[in-house]
């Protein structure tokens, strides 16, 4: 929506200084009491709270939400052959019980070894065999023994929520790192823009004629990976599994036909919808998406965005810059820092809506 300049393609142009105390270590309670920086077109930022959202949207708008659910992906076990402690992060399932994982210590877990999980290594609750190394990630392919139902049951008992590396507290309430509308297990990180919604807020929006429609994009570990090429156009985006239901496509088409706005809740919802429309036509179905959105991108569907404040030099900052312009985004971030906003996964939010009107 904004024409790029050559400077928009330099990685250093997406850097900014964030005081460490602005990194939120826990979520605001209640969920919708997070602050909301409203970014209209060609006006100053408005400072609101997330519970003000109904006054900032209008009947006929459609919110696209990502209904992925975070799995308790971090496991601690022992190498059966030696008793060496092992930490496993489940990354993505490729068939029942067969997982790409990141492991510590990786060098000691060669194909053919096995890992026991549970308080008693002599009688483990889960056992996984190391089948192969993965050169692309440095991880390991593990096959868990037993039935899928038993695996998921034990994972719920043994697994821990994989909080982002910049959060140094533990999840006292794992549900606080899930959206209230999460349904489909498979993510290793939450679609954090959605953490601000409450059931009551969603009901209020629905009563006003502001609908929601789900997509599923299972957020992977690549979401935390920084861009490491100086010319961002050379960046290779990680891929993630996504599904866009036919009913969501129908709602989007009806919204557009009626003159409504399609507003993505989070960058993952953006990538799912824009990825499904990459051919020029929005199509339902399941696929993998590795769409990298940066200044110069030609938007297909999305009119607005609800998102948190992102890490410097991240692909997420580049996506938001494609919507409102890099200079304006950095200016908004500077204002947010000065106004003591909270940043990153448990932080505050932005509503980017070019034709927003102050109520």
From Swiss-Prot:
Question: What EC number is given for this enzyme?
Answer: 2.4.99.17
Pfam families, alphabetized: Queuosine_synth (PF02547)
Q: What catalytic activity is recorded?
A: 7-aminomethyl-7-carbaguanosine(34) in tRNA + S-adenosyl-L-methionine = epoxyqueuosine(34) in tRNA + adenine + L-methionine + 2 H(+)
MF term (GO), any: S-adenosylmethionine:tRNA ribosyltransferase-isomerase activity
User: Where, subcellularly, is it found?
Assistant: Cytoplasm
Ribosomal protein as UniProt keyword? no
Keywords (A to Z) from UniProt: Cytoplasm, Queuosine biosynthesis, S-adenosyl-L-methionine, Transferase
Q: In which pathway does it act?
A: tRNA modification; tRNA-queuosine biosynthesis
Provide a GO biological process annotation. tRNA wobble guanine modification
Specify whether Phosphoprotein is a keyword of the entry.
no
Query: Which Gene Ontology cellular component terms are annotated?
Result: cytoplasm
Top EC class for this record: transferase
Q: What family does the database annotate?
A: Belongs to the QueA family.
The protein's job, in short, is: Transfers and isomerizes the ribose moiety from AdoMet to the 7-aminomethyl group of 7-deazaguanine (preQ1-tRNA) to give epoxyqueuosine (oQ-tRNA).
Subunit relationships: Monomer.
Name-wise, this protein is S-adenosylmethionine:tRNA ribosyltransferase-isomerase
């Amino acid at each position: 929506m904004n024409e790029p300049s050559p400077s928009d393609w330099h990685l250093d142009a997406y850097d900014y200084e964030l005081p460490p105390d602005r990194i939120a270590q826990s979520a605001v309670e209640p969920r919708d009491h997070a602050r909301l920086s409203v970014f209209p077109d060609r006006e100053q930022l408005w400072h609101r709270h997330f519970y003000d959202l109904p006054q900032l949207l209008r009947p006929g708008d459609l919110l696209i939400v990502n209904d992925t659910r975070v799995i308790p992906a971090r496991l601690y076990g022992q190498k059966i052959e030696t008793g060496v402690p092992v930490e496993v992060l489940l990354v993505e399932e490729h068939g029942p019980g067969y997982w790409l994982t990141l492991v510590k210590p990786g060098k000691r877990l060669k194909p053919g070894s096995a890992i026991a999980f549970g308080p008693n290594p002599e009688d483990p609750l889960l056992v996984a065999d190391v089948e192969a190394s993965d050169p692309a990630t440095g991880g390991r392919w593990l096959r868990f023994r037993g039935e899928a139902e038993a695996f998921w049951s034990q994972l719920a008992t043994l697994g821990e929520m994989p909080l982002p590396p910049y959060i140094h507290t533990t999840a006292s309430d794992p549900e606080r790192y899930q959206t209230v509308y999460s349904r489909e297990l498979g993510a290793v990180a939450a679609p954090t823009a959605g953490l601000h919604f409450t059931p009551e807020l969603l009901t209020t929006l629905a009563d006003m004629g502001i609908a929601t429609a789900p997509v599923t994009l299972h957020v992977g570990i690549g979401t935390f990976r920084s861009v490491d090429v100086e010319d961002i156009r050379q960046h290779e985006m990680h891929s993630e599994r996504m599904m866009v239901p036919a009913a969501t496509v129908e709602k989007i088409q009806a919204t557009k036909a009626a003159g409504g706005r399609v507003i993505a809740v989070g960058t993952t919802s953006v990538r799912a919808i824009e990825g499904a429309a990459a051919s020029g036509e929005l199509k339902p179905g399941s696929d993998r998406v590795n769409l990298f959105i940066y200044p110069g991108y030609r938007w297909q569907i999305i009119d607005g965005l609800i998102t948190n404040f992102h890490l410097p030099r991240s692909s997420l900052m580049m996506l938001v810059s494609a919507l409102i312009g890099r200079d304006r985004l950095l200016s908004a971030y500077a204002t947010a820092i000065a106004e003591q906003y909270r940043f990153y996964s448990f932080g505050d939010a932005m509503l980017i809506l070019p034709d927003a009107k102050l109520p």
